[in-house]
Amino acid sequence: MLFSSLLCVFVAFSYSGSSVAQKVTQAQSSVSMPVRKAVTLNCLYETSWWSYYIFWYKQLPSKEMIFLIRQGSDEQNAKSGRYSVNFKKAAKSVALTISALQLEDSAKYFCALGE
């Protein structure tokens, strides 16, 4: 059945910190991809911080937040299992790629910026 072989990924973005100089945005609101394929979720940010981290989380239907991966501003591209990050500091862009998609990957994804 075609529907059961597709998953939906909803993208939402947030930031942490006390200053309005920190901002996280996205262009994708939802993505549908077949299982076993890969999907890339984009996150653009603005910050005045010299050193910072970008975190990716997945929110389950139960509203539970699951930490996926962290990217440091002075680190090489992060990778953890099926999750990998393409970090472009000069472009203020960080993209999360999820490989070998599974139906369990259907969720809302959050990109967060913190010190």
UniProtKB/Swiss-Prot annotation:
Major subcellular location class: membrane
Keywords, sorted A to Z: Adaptive immunity, Cell membrane, Disulfide bond, Immunity, Immunoglobulin domain, Innate immunity, Membrane, Receptor, Signal, T cell receptor
InterPro entries registered for this protein in UniProt: Ig-like_dom, Ig-like_dom_sf, Ig-like_fold, Ig_V-set, TCR_variable_region
Residues spanning the membrane: none
Disulfide bond positions: 43-111
Record's subcellular location: Cell membrane
Full protein name: T cell receptor delta variable 1
